[in-house]
Structure formats: C-alpha cells, structure tokens
Amino acid sequence: MAEEQARHVKNGLECIRALKAEPIGSLAIEEAMAAWSEISDNPGQERATCREEKAGSSGLSKPCLSAIGSTEGGAPRIRGQGPGESDDDAETLGIPPRNLQASSTGLQCYYVYDHSGEAVKGIQDADSIMVQSGLDGDSTLSGGDNESENSDVDIGEPDTEGYAITDRGSAPISMGFRASDVETAEGGEIHELLRLQSRGNNFPKLGKTLNVPPPPDPGRASTSGTPIKKGTERRLASFGTEIASLLTGGATQCARKSPSEPSGPGAPAGNVPECVSNAALIQEWTPESGTTISPRSQNNEEGGDYYDDELFSDVQDIKTALAKIHEDNQKIISKLESLLLLKGEVESIKKQINRQNISISTLEGHLSSIMIAIPGLGKDPNDPTADVEINPDLKPIIGRDSGRALAEVLKKPVASRQLQGMTNGRTSSRGQLLKEFQLKPIGKKMSSAVGFVPDTGPASRSVIRSIIKSSRLEEDRKRYLMTLLDDIKGANDLAKFHQMLMKIIMK
C-alpha cells in the first residue's frame, strides 16, 4: 500500500512540474472541462467503456484514463484516442510536440469501480486524494495524508450525484517505486502555478474549479472522524478512516472503532528502557519522505500483536480447557499405573494361593497314607494292660478312638468294666487309675506350689535372698538384712527370719 501511494504521489508531482514548465492554454482547459462535464452527465457510457478495457483482468479494480491521461511515451491525450492521435490532440491542447517527446509522464486521472462494476464519481484514493463531483459547479481537489485525516467528509455518505463512496479495493503494487523515491513539492509552488495560469491566460471559470489547500502541517494534531489508530507523541492518525468492506470473502476486515477517545497527548516513548524486548523501531513522519509507514503494517509484520478481544478471550478459554483436559488425563494415567501395580500384586497372590493349595493337597495325601500305631502294642502278655483292645485296622489319627488312652491308665480294661456295669444294671462313668499314675498328697512341711517352707538347704537361702533383692526397701536396709541372713544357722531361726521379712515387706 505504501509503495502504491508513493507511485501516485510521484506521478502527480511530475505532472505538476510539467504543467508549471509548459502551462496549458485556456482553450484546451475549456475543452477538457466540457469533456469532463459530458462524462459526468453520461456515467453509463463511461462505465461501459471501462468494462471493456478491464475485460480479462483478475478481478482487481484498475484505473482508467479520463479526459487527460498519459500514453506509454508520456504524451497527454484525450480519453478514447489511439496512439497515433496523441500528437494532433497535443497540438490542440496547446502543448508543443517536443515537450511530449521529452516528458516521460503526464497528468493522470483514475476512475474507481466498486465490486459490482459500477463507476464511482467520488472516492478517497490510496494516496488520500479526494475528488468530489457535484451539481454546484465546484470541485475541490484535496491532497495530503493529514488533509484526508482532518477533512469532515463522511466516506460512507453518497455524493451529490447519488453514487455511494466505497472502498475501491486493492490494486497491484508497482515494485519500481519506493517511498524513499518520492519527492515533495511545496504548497507555494502549486499556488504560484495556478496564479500564473490565471494571469497569463485569463480564461473564464467554466464548469468546475480546482482548489488546492495549503500543505499539511505534520505537527498539527489530527482530529479525524473515526480514526483507526492514533500514533504516539505527535498523535498522527493512520491513513484513511474506518470504511465498511463490501467484500464477502478474501478481504481483510476493518478494525473496529475504539470506544475511548484520547483526552490528552500520547505518552512519550523516549523513556522506554533499552532492555524491553518487545519495543519495535518506530519511523517518524518527516516532510522529506512524503508519506508515512502505517503502524498497522508494522504491527502485522511483528506477528499480529493486535487481536480482537473476543477472539483472544476465546483462545484463552480454549487453552484453559485444554490444560484442564491435560491435567485430567495425567490423573487418569497415574490411576491406571496404580491399577497395573495392583494387577501385578494380585497375580503374585494368586500364585501363592496356588502353591499353598498344592502343599495342602500333598499333606492330605501323606496323612491319608500314614498309619499311627496305638501305644502299648507288643507289650508283655503278663502286663495287666495287655488285655486292652488294639485296633486291628490301625486307622489314621483322624479316626482314632479318644477312649483308648484311658484303658491304659485304668485298673480294669474297658470291656470288662462295660460287662460288669451291664450285669449290675448300671454303667460306671468313673474308673480308678493305677497307683503308679496317681498323684501323691501335698505335705504341709515341704515347699510346694501352695507355699514356701524354708529349710536348711541352700535353695531356701537363695529364695530368701531373691525376696530381699526384689523388695522396695532401701539399699541400706537390704544390705543389713543380707548380713543377718548369713548369720542365721538353724532351720527354726531361718523360718522366723522369713516370717519377719514378709511382715516388713508387706508394710
């Protein structure tokens, strides 16, 4: 876009220099004005001609030569001429033929078509030049970036002839022109040119008048109607104002209008620390450059720092949801890993249970084959217990009779006792043990589990020493009692000492 603007500005400046060097005669200007009026009165014919010229194009809006244009050789000619008619028409306009050969460019006017193919009479071009046509016979040519920003013209409103002003779309960019190649012209030169033409020719004002405003002041604050974006420090507005796009697809949508208006001068960027990583180089506007670099284009080159608020919030919500899903997946994976560990433990438990079942089966097989002999087998026949019945089958221990052990310790065999009980009409539930199996009665003068009776033996003295040591008496008293125990000799004295010791401990 910047290169296209530079190309338009350069062509316009060269046309102004050519007009200043060789002013156009009054007759030629009157004829040009008359032709322009005819074109304005018959817009349908002009649109049909331009449709034929742009047939076969790629769909982009292209300029069309109007009343005064430039041929390939640079000679101006009337619209609709062929290449061979340019010299004759140049003589009619009052321009010498030598100047036509020497000049490389001429005055060029553009027609802009909307996306439906209709010609637009008034349009703000890419180089910020507004051409308005109306019925009042007054046409104003305004130029300059700041002028377009400061103008009060509403781009979205129709002109006096009923044609709506729309965006002309994108145009091919010429790679042969750059912004640095554009030369500037002072506003005084343009006014001087118009003054010389009015004095030398004294032609009457017919049709429309060309009014050129003074050169724009770059230091003056811009107060555009709906600026797209404000600059920094000097508060320079960007090119153009907000225009609704008529394209349904393939066009970059316009930025929305900011609801907040600047209340004061912008913040200066001179105190920005050098360590800031996201501060980009900003090229300031200079009168020598003739144009400015759009801040929006710089932002686009930096990777798209301008996001729509709603789209940015939606992207953040999506990122948050994805992070939550990722966290849930991590939890599920950790639980699955714990399940895998439990699965391994369950498998090991199953193996242990199988081994235990095998061991139990082996023990059952051994127990079923082992035969336990009854005690007393093979005794002497003269032994009183020899009459006890012996299991002839030697059954396993599981099926052993629990009453067989009693027959070995009782005085009479079980069979004889059962027969005796049946003859007496009653059964005896109790049997008498043999004397060798009977316990002796407990003696009161001997030590037993019932009580301790001291005697002259060393065991009795050891028991008394243990009683003294385990008591809660003081150490001095324990040592005194140990000395007394060593001095006692008789059994009676030892018994009295034991009784005295138990009384002292029980206190």
Swiss-Prot record:
The lineage of its organism: Viruses, Riboviria, Orthornavirae, Negarnaviricota, Haploviricotina. Residues 146-160 have a biased composition (Acidic residues). Homotetramer. Interacts (via multimerization domain and XD domain) with polymerase L; this interaction forms the polymerase L-P complex. Interacts (via N-terminus) with N0 (via Ncore); this interaction allows P to chaperon N0 to avoid N polymerization and non-specific RNA binding before encapsidation. Interacts (via C-terminus) with N-RNA template (via Ntail); this interaction maintains the P/L complex anchored to the nucleocapsid template during the sequential transcription. Interacts (via C-terminus) with protein C this interaction allows C to associate with the ribonucleocapsid. Residues 304-376 are annotated as: Multimerization. Residues 361-377, 396-410 are annotated as: Interaction with the L polymerase. The modification Phosphoserine is found at residues 86, 151. This is Phosphoprotein. Residues 134-145, 260-270 have a biased composition (Low complexity). CDD domains: MEV_P-protein-C_like. Essential cofactor of the RNA polymerase L that plays a central role in the transcription and replication by forming the polymerase complex with RNA polymerase L and recruiting L to the genomic N-RNA template for RNA synthesis. Also plays a central role in the encapsidation of nascent RNA chains by forming the encapsidation complex with the nucleocapsid protein N (N-P complex). Acts as a chaperone for newly synthesized free N protein, so-called N0, allowing encapsidation of nascent RNA chains during replication. One of its GO terms (molecular function) is RNA-directed RNA polymerase activity. Phosphorylation on serines by host CK2 is necessary for the formation of viral factories. Residues 41-99, 134-163, 201-231, 250-273 are annotated as: Disordered. Keywords: Phosphoprotein, Viral RNA replication. Residues 457-507 are annotated as: X domain (XD). Belongs to the morbillivirus P protein family.
